[in-house]
Amino acid sequence: LSLTRSGDNQLYTVDATTALNRTSRFRVENLLAGGNLRTVTDPNGLVNTTLLGLDNSRTITSPDGTVTRTTQYPDPRFGLQAPLSNLTVTTPNGLVSTLTTTRSATLSDPDDIFSLTAMVDMLILNGRAFASVYDPALLKFTDTTPEGRQTVSFIDSQGRILKEQVSGLEDTDFSYDVRGRLTSVAQGAGASERLSSISYNPNGFVASVTDPLNRSVQFQYDPTGRVTKQILPDLREINFTYDANGNVSSITPPGRPAHDFQYTQVDLESEYRPPAIGLPEHRTQFFYDLDKKPTSIVRPDGLSIAFNYDVGGRLINFVLPRG
C-alpha cells in the first residue's frame, strides 16, 4: 500500500494505492463557513461524504444516496464531555428512521455534579420508547421496553452488576474477586440454583470454567498467554500449537491425529491439512491476490472454487465446481 498526499491544511487529498493499483482517494476540506467536509472515493468511483458541522452534527451521505445525520447535545451533568446524540437515517426513496435520546438528572446540590439523586434516560426509536431509571441510593437501574417488560439491575460502587431481575425468571447474581474479575453467575436459589463459576491462574488468564452440572473445562497457556491445552470434563485433552507469528499451526483433538494449518508470508491461511483418511490428497489450499483477497480454494478432490472481482476489488461472483 502506497500513500500520496497533496494540498495544504485548508484542502488536502490522500491517495491510497494497493499492490494491484486500486486507488482510493481521501479528500478533507476545512470549509470557510466552518465545519469540515470529508470525501472518500473508492476504486470504483463511488463517493461517500461526511460533513462535520459547527453544531456538533455529522452528516454521512452514502453512494446510494442514503443520508445518516447524527447530532450531539450536552449531558445535563458533564456537558459535551459526555455528549448524548440523536440519529436520523433517510433512504433515497424517502423512508426515515429516527433515534432520539434524552436524559434528565436530579441533583441535591446544583453545584455538585456527583450529588445525583435520580436519573432518567429515554431512547425513542421511531416513536417507540425505551426507558432507563437509575436510583443512586439503591444503586438500581430499572429498564422498561415499549411493551412494558422490565429488567431491574443492581450494581456495586464500582459499577459492576450484582443482581439482575427479569419478570417471570429467577434472579441472577454475579460475584467478583478482589481484582474485579467475574467469578460466578448464579440463577435461582436453594436446590434449584444454577451456578457457573470461573477461576483464574496467577497470570490472570481463565484457568477453568465450571457449569451448573459441575462439569469443568480447564485451560493451560504458554508464556505469551496463548491456550496450549484444553482439558475437558472427562479429562480428555485438546492441544494447540502456534507458528512463530502466533497463528494456530495445529489442533489435536482427544485421541486423534492433529489438524494442521499453514499460512502465507502475510499470515493468511494457505493450507488446511486434516488427518490422513486414505485419499491421495486430503488438504485444502487457499490462494490470494496481492490485495489479500481470496482468489481460489482448491479442495482435496482437486476441484476449485473461484472468486471474481471488479476493477475496484468488489466481489462479483464465485464459481462452484459441479463435478
Could you tell me what each predicted segment is?
Residues 1-42, 46-62, 66-211, 215-232, ...:
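Beta-strand elements of repeat-based all-beta scaffolds
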